[in-house]
Every structure is written in structure tokens, then in C-alpha cells.
Amino acid sequence: MNQTVEYLKELTVIASPTGFTEEVANYLVKTLADMGYSPVRTAKGGVTVVLRGENDEQHRYITAHVDTLGAIVRAVKPDGRLKLDRIGGFPWNMIEGENCTVHVANTGKTHSGTILVHQTSCHVYKDAGTVERTQDNMEVRLDEKVTNEKETRALGIEVGDFVSFDPRTIVTDTGFIKSRHLDDKVSAAILLNLLRVYKEEQIQLPVTTTFAFSVFEEVGHGANSSIPAEVVEYLAVDMGAMGDDQATDEYTVSICVKDASGPYHYEFRQHLVALAKAQEIPYKLDIYPFYGSDASAAMSAGAEVKHALLGAGIESSHSYERTHLDSVVATERMVDAYLKSDLVD
């Protein structure tokens, strides 16, 4: 588990908003190659690696996404601040006050800043606490001596430059992990650690399995293509959603029965439940009302597979998120148990 957390820390510090994932993909390629694998880059920019199993006629496909929420420069304002367009689904208040980095395409340089509502100063604006946070009043205050549009553009900053959010990753003495982008870098870290263990211990899985790290999940079309024709089971490893009426918590693995796309495959879900019970893996079944996954994207694209979704319970999703090591352990055990099991009947 220590190595899983180390992978997570390494992943979260790499800026990878959807559409700006080259660095994280290079990290995956190097990490997997150092393990002894032969990773492949997809045309969309994702990374896959295939483990040949005893059954090489029917395959499995397992995914985690390494793209994250982020933003892109929409305009340079007359006062030199930046107007943003969001990447991924989140309300503006979830990034208010967050430090950020502007990745300048023209120069290759980065510039730090902070995302604020225009009416932030409570000594000046009476409506600082009540004004609706919208694209028109949320802005980036750059950490540069700029007071107008010309000075900001002189830095090379232009429309289309990506903006990443400071992850602020912390692991507490009590076992909690606090960070942005636990969705879905926790899952990616879990898959990396399992791949490491399988290689070091020379474990052959019962079924040939493609491990896919996707880079467009947050905008709805992650690992929905390049699925081998032999694949009959598709498992997305992604965060479990917490909140009112939710069963998911920070200490178990969450198995999704339905999200915004509809129900997941019943027999596949029950296969996972049976494994959890047999191996005493703490789990919860849950519904995620406003949610989609790589697996649901694949189904929408026409994949003819059984599909399922599970993951660690993540509190405050798409904000400053939190989970616990207990949930990470349960999720890793669940994925391992599934990959070592027979195909779903």
C-alpha cells in the first residue's frame, strides 16, 4: 500500500487537465517500461498495456483515467486578469480561492496565479459573499506585475492556454488522503501497483487483460475506443460518490449499480459482490445520480461487453477531495480479486 500512495503522490503533482495530458502519459510509459512492460500510446493519447492470460481467446479491459478537471484561457481581460472556460463538470465555487498554474503554449513557460471571484475584497464589495459565481466574474489573478491586457499578453499568454489546479496532496497520520484529482488518480495508482506486483511476482492472470489509462474521461469520451474485439468484460475503476442518501463511504470499496447512463451489468455486479463476500472485502453498493464513467462511455459508443464500475469512496468530489487508506486498500483488493477470478457467467 505504501507504493500505491507513492504512485498517487507522483501522479497528483503532474498537471493533466483533459487535453493537456502528455506529461502524465510520458510518466506512465516510463513507469510501466521500468517495470518491464511494453506500454502502447493510443491515437487519443492514452496508455495501454496487455497482460497475456491463460485464456487468450476472451479478454478483459480495465480502465482508470489520468485526465483531470481544469480550465483553459477564454480571454485576457482589460485589467490583465484571465477569464476561464471550464474543463470537466464542476460549479465555479469549487475552485474559488485555489492556486493554479497557467501553461503557456507560446513560450513553454508556466505562470502561477489564484482563481478568485472579481468581487473578492469584502472591504469594497458588499455582495462579496452573495454574488453568483459565474464565468463572467471568476478570474485568474496572475502572480505577475500586470495591470492591463497588453502586459499579460507580453508574457505570451493567449486564449487556449491550459490552467491546472494546485492538488495540495496531503496524507494524514490518521490515514486520510486529501487532494484534488483523487478522481481518478487513486485508481490509476492502484492499477500501477497491481501491475508492479504482477510483474515482480510473475503472476499470470487467468484471462488476457488490457490495462488502459484514459485521458478524456472528464469530458465524456475516455476509453470508449480502441477496445480489442476479444474483450467481453469491461471494468472501470473510478471514484465512488458520497453525499445524502449515498451508501458509499471513505472506508470501503464502492460498487456502482447505476449512474446517469443507467444500470450496470447485473451479473457482473453480482460477480464482484460474491468475490467481496468470499474474500471479506468491505464493500458498498451504490447509485451515482450525476455521473458517467469510461465504461458507460464505451457502452454509448456501441461496445458489446459486460460492464461494471467500482472505486474508492471519494468525499467532496470535484472539489478538494478526501478518501481514506482503508478505502484504497479495499479497492485494490477488489480489483485484484476480480482480475484473478474466472470470467463472469
What are these regions (language model features)?
Residues 1-345:
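N-terminal hydrophobic/helix-forming segments and targeting peptides
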